[in-house]
Amino acid sequence: MTRLCAVAAAVCVLAAAGMAQTGAPKYQKLTITEKFYCEGAYFGDFNKDGKMDVVSGPFWYEGPDFQKKHEYRPVKEYQPTGYSDNFLTFCADFNGDGWMDVFCVPFPGAEGFWFENNQGKDGPWPKHSALKGVDGESPCWGDVNGDGRPDLICCNGGFYGYATYDPAKGDQPWKFVPVTPKGRYSRYAHGQGFGDINGDGKVDLLESGAWWEQPKEAKAGEPWVRHAYPFAGAAAQLLVYDVDGDGLNDVVTAVQCHGYGLVWHKQVRDEKGQISFKQNVILPPNPDLKGSELRISQLHALEVADVNGDGVPDVLTGKRFWAHGPKGDKEPSAPAVVYWFIVNRDKAKGVTFTPVMVDDNSGVGTQVAACDLNGDKVPDVIVGNKKGTFIFLSK
C-alpha cells in the first residue's frame, strides 16, 4: 500500500467516525459530467418551477434530479492541465425581469459577462458585459453596500473593492467601487472576503494581509480604513462569522491555497476595544508528509453553512485538483477530497473542528457551493472543476 493510499484509508475511517459523532449527513454522489468546463458551479431556479437548479460551465441542469441539461452559452471543453474561462459562477436577477440570470467570473483579469435568462425559450441566453477586468482568484458574492442586492467583491485596475449592478439598468456595465488606494491588487491576487469585523453593522472587506473597515458614511473615491493583520500567506475566500459564540466575528481561511494549512483567527479586543486576532490551527500549514494525520493541499475554495442543524455554521472546503497542473504545487495528484469541518463549541475544551469527508474523487475548484437542493433543509454540495461537475445530495 502506498503512503497516499494509507493516508486515504485512515482518512476514510476518521470520516466515518466523524459522521457518526457530529450528526453530519451522508451524501449521494451525482456525477453530472467528467468534462472540464469550469472551476466554479452555483445554483438558482432558472425555469421558475420552484425547484433549485444547478449551473456549471455552459450548461444549467434541471432539479430535482439534474439529468436534463440546457446549453445557455457556447460549449467549450478544456484540458485539466490548463485553465478554463470560468473560475466562479454567481446568480441573481440582473435586469429585474423576475428570472434568475448567470454571471461567470472569468479567468483572472479577463472581462466578466452575465447571461440573461431567456425565460424558457430555446437557444443561447443574451450576453452582457458586466466588468471589463475581474481581478483576483477568489471573488466573493455578498451585499457590501446594504442595498439588498449581492455585490461582486474583487480587484479591478490595481484596486480592491466591489462591483454593483442596477436591475433597472440591466443593459449597463456594473459599477466598480474601490475601497483601497491603488496598489498591488493584480489579476492573480489571492485572498478576498467580506463580513462585519467590528460589529458596527457595516460590511468590511478582507484580504490576506489586512481588513478594510467600511466607514459609517462611505464616500466615493475615499479609501476605507486599513487594519493590517496576517490572516494568510495566500488565502482563497476568507470566511467571516462568529466561530466560538462570543459575539465577535472571527475569520476562517486557508493559510496557503497552493500549499497546506487551514486556520481560524479568533477576534480579541483589549480594554480600549482595539481589535486583534489569535490564530488557531485546524490543519497544520507544515504537515508531516510521512505521517497519517489529515492533510489537504490546495484548499482553494471555502464556504460556510450549518450542515448538521445545530445552529453553528460549519466550514466546507477541499482540494483543488491540479491547481497548477500535474507537476505544480504540493501533492498535486493526491486524492481530490471534499470535506466538512464541523464546529463544536465546548466550554471546557474550547472550539474544535471535526473533519467529515464528503468525497475523495472530485475536490473543489476555485469555488465550492452549499445549498439545500432537495428540500430536506440540509445543505447539499455543488462542485465544478477539472474533474467534472458533481452534486452531493444529503440522504
Task: Walk through the language-model features, giving the residues of each.
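N-terminal secretory signal peptides that target proteins for export/translocation
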Residues: 1-2
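Bacterial N-terminal signal peptides
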Residues: 5-17
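Beta-propeller-forming repeat regions
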Residues: 18-395
